[in-house]
């Protein structure tokens, strides 16, 4: 489910060409670098599951390590960031669906209609619980990774444009101008993998399955992304791939598919990109619902949202709210005549990506603070070291992302400042809410982070 959230086919066909256009043949290495950073973070992240039981993930972990004020602020930021990512991608999904239907059937359907249909499908699957959602996403994930592997194998079997070579992994390629900007895209490609912890209460044997799923997801994405992008370098040749990507960002993968596999595979890939984005939407919908449920359970949001479905046991009330919010935003953008890609996807996704990486940095700090405060330095030495390293690595990634934000938005300085600043505004609002609860509703404040049933939690923060 967490790999489906990252939408491998959408990330590769939709975003990797831009990474190649900016960074050239060294772009595949950026995905490995991001994967290594997230692997270190995953070690620290999983070290906290024993202390929190995985309830609320970022929300609980940060509360346990840095206190309830930071915890609630992070919980609010997580809900808003995931919603921004998920609702923004409906714009991309609508564009992809429109193009696929137009290419195959010759029918022109307005993008808001397609987005609203997708919202209904996501609501239906999410409502039926993790088992149905996981099986459905598993099928879609197999199809989208399968078509990418077909392309990569065909390229390698035919020897690429000028033979198979490995200049991608040379220092000249890795440290080429533009590679710092490529890292922003590479880190964004891993969005959602940390949501494994949100399913702890619904998983079988969570002490083993959750860490295993997290490490497997990070490792698979890092190697798979690097391999596929490297294969595209072979398809066009190291000397020409950057120019080819710059000239034809949208169709780079489709052109390679037509050349090395055939037009039939190109049609299949255009349809699977739609299902790839749909799978991502379902996975993010489920993550949002569980964050909302955790906050409502603790009284930080209306308690009506902590109700589960009587049959499927999914957080259905939270799912209903998320669905309504998505529909309202899509309708508003549609009525305003906004562009679904440049004005919906980019405007909403940018603060979402910044917010999630910021939360990962804060979580890394929380791991370090918790183990030091509880004197677990010796017992959790690996988790502590991983927390320090991931704070540094992800902190640098966040700085690179903000410094190169124009590559994601193609907007001016003022607009970019507003988008990045909105992340800070949400966090400050969360701090304000926590301070209000501490002063006026102490019982609710005591419940923040789910720490009211944790015998090891501090009651003073």
Task: Show which residues each predicted segment covers.
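C-terminal membrane-solvent junction of multi-pass transporters and transport-like membrane proteins
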Residues: 1, 173, 305-309, 357-406
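Membrane-interface loop-to-helix entry segments
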Residues: 1, 111-161, 213-222, 355-358, ...
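Transmembrane helix-boundary motif of multi-pass solute transporters/channels
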Residues: 1-99, 196, 403-410, 414-425
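Membrane-interface "cap" regions at the ends of multi-pass membrane proteins
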Residues: 1-26, 39, 43, 163-172, ...
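Helix-loop-helix junctions that connect adjacent transmembrane segments
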Residues: 27-28, 104-110, 138-270
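Membrane-helix boundary/coupling elements in multi-pass transport proteins
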Residues: 54, 77-92, 197-202, 263-303, ...
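TM-loop-TM module centered on a large, flexible mid-protein loop between adjacent transmembrane helices
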Residues: 60-61, 67, 99-103, 219-284, ...
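Terminal cytosolic tails of multi-pass membrane transporters
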Residues: 364-386, 407-461
């Amino acid at each position: 489910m967490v790999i489906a959230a990252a939408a491998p086919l959408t990330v590769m066909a939709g975003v990797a060409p831009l990474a190649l256009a900016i960074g050239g043949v060294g772009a595949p290495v950026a995905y490995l670098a991001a994967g290594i950073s997230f692997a270190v973070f995953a070690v620290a992240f999983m070290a906290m599951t024993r202390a929190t039981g995985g309830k609320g993930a970022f929300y609980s972990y940060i509360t346990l390590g840095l206190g309830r004020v930071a915890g609630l602020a992070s919980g609010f930021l997580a809900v808003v960031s995931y919603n921004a990512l998920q609702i923004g991608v409906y714009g991309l999904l609508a564009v992809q669906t429109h193009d696929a239907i137009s290419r195959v059937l010759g029918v022109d359907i307005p993008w808001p209609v397609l987005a609203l249909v997708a919202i209904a499908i996501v609501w239906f699957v999410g409502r039926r619980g993790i088992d149905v959602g996981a099986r459905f996403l598993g099928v879609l994930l197999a199809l989208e990774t399968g078509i990418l592997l077909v392309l990569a194998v065909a390229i390698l079997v035919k020897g690429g444009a000028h033979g198979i070579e490995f200049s991608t992994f040379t220092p000249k390629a890795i440290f080429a101008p533009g590679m710092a900007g490529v890292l922003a895209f590479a880190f964004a490609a891993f969005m959602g993998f940390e949501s494994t912890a949100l399913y702890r209460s619904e998983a079988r044997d969570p002490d083993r399955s959750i860490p295993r799923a997290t490490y497997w997801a990070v490792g698979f994405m890092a190697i798979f992304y690097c391999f596929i992008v490297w294969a595209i370098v072979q398809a066009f040749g190291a000397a020409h791939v950057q120019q080819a990507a710059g000239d034809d960002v949208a169709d780079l993968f489709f052109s390679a598919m037509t050349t090395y596999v055939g037009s039939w595979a190109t049609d299949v890939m255009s349809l699977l990109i739609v299902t790839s984005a749909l799978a991502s939407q379902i996975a993010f919908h489920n993550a949002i619902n569980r964050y909302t449920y955790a906050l409502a359970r603790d009284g930080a949001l209306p308690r009506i949202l902590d109700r589960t479905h009587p049959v499927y046991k999914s957080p259905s009330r939270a799912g209903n709210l998320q669905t309504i919010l998505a529909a309202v935003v899509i309708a508003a953008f549609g009525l305003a005549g906004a562009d679904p890609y440049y004005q919906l996807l980019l405007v909403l996704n940018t603060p979402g990506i910044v917010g999630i990486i910021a939360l990962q940095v804060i979580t890394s700090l929380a791991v370090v603070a918790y183990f030091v405060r509880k004197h677990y330095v010796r017992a959790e030495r690996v988790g502590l070291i991983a927390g320090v390293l991931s704070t540094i690595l992800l902190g640098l990634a966040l700085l690179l992302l903000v410094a190169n934000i124009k590559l994601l938005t193609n907007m001016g300085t003022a607009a970019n400042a507003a988008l990045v600043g909105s992340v800070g505004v949400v966090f400050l609002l969360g701090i304000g809410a926590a301070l209000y609860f501490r002063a006026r509703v102490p019982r609710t404040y005591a419940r923040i982070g789910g720490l009211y049933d944790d015998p090891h939690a501090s009651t003073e923060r």
